[in-house]
């Protein structure tokens, strides 16, 4: 039986009423309907949908809860990377940030900033298509996150359908998922009453609740989503400033911070910081600092980005919390490059929202500066509310049996000699790959997402491979088979097969990734990319002199020395030969007469691509010397437009710019051999 017009009208009326009261409750914090009356509306809507299941839509208020539990989280690639923010920890650093960006864009001291609290929660991205929630993802590694769509749908402050006018066809909204202090206390009290494990702090509670495979568990947790930024926007326009955009998001149905402010000049930013720091404890949620963003989007675009963060924003972190505890012992850990680091073993202490039992002591110089001994009472601080460190000792509490900390004269793992290098505070194991610790760390680095991206090769598996002498260097990974891997602890035949497939897939890589994966000291991702683009082949990098290396962007004498030293070692060259013999392949980069073929051009990517991701397309264009921008202007050389291209394509057509579809892009890349 089809639903009558009266039923359809009633259905829409109930949806609108419930959405209205949801906004009052979750976004405005101003409910005007008793819970019992709200429940009646909800039950009435449920009854109609049960009678006419064909009328149930994804954006119905009843669909926030009820999805079936998942076996695991799928991955979602962000259309635009979710970058982190750089931090400052004092006013001097904040003022230096302001001067740096004003000098870059020639702005006066009244530069306008948007100011808002930095929530201590979990970053998430919501993607809306035609005003309806399509997908939701965690930040992940900034490029790929976990699909948490069903869990985010259960959060009352997440609109399933946007309201208002001028909603873009595609809109990505980014924000923080957090658990209010009152909700955190309540769920811990409930857990204690049931003799269940409690959460350490609201952030952990939010993370644990958001990553439940069963959305019905997430639905019972008091989570809140607060929007703080936008990502991809297609088929629509945003206001000209960040602050106005937050206001627009509020009008579309999102919760945004009531504490946001506009500051004219860095002095007003400083005043806002002190204002919110004083108010911090009275807020309903945890914050760990303030975020300042250049307000005007056109200035943000001029400032651009560094490798991992925007130049136009900074997080001013609150002073870390400190606590007293006792140093029980010191252990020495060996890192990938052989650096031997002292780690303090502490009497567990609750500080900064977590229980701390270990802290870094950095190196011998730091231990001497502190004058610290085993048995001392120490002050522990969580620097930036993240990394525990010992900042001082309480000498008056030193016991008579306190003992000096003695650094090892031999590697604590392999027994090799240790060396002190002039100008360095660290001591290093000379064992190289003879040292199991260095072998393990080098293999973990090689397999990491930013390097060879071998999915499933976790730390514990690497430890077993080295301990069982199945792998001696990174090239040995490509000799592993399913029976060998299936014999490892907690790794069955199916997981072993998946891992072998991932290892096989990693054989096709790029020159910059293999340079980074090799683990050359001080060669990070950006330096590896610069080396690749400058020399174009691995052989040329391997044979380069220090003088030639110093000509590369951002490569100084120290890095040049490490690169030369790495390739001077016969065992490293042998590993590279073994990788090539195993079928690992990285194409050379073509460069004509020393000039990259697309140097001086600016490309813009919009819409979706089928044969490669937008990040892959961006990497390939940059490898050819092109600049890849996020917006279209008269200076744009070409716009690459895939399905779903919106306002950027329209603007390109209006400006008469060159436009390529995916076929044209692939032809361009093939022409230049990438």
From Swiss-Prot:
Its cofactor is Mg(2+); Mn(2+). It comes from the Bacteria. GO terms for molecular function: DNA binding; DNA ligase (NAD+) activity; metal ion binding. SMART domains: BRCT, HhH1, LIGANc. Keywords: DNA damage, DNA repair, DNA replication, Ligase, Magnesium, Manganese, Metal-binding, NAD, Zinc. CDD domains: BRCT_DNA_ligase_like, LIGANc. Its EC number is 6.5.1.2. The active site is at 118 (n6-amp-lysine intermediate). It is an enzyme of class 6 (ligase). GO terms for cellular component: cytosol. Belongs to the NAD-dependent DNA ligase family. LigA subfamily. This is DNA ligase. It comes from Saccharophagus degradans (strain 2-40 / ATCC 43961 / DSM 17024). The gene is ligA.
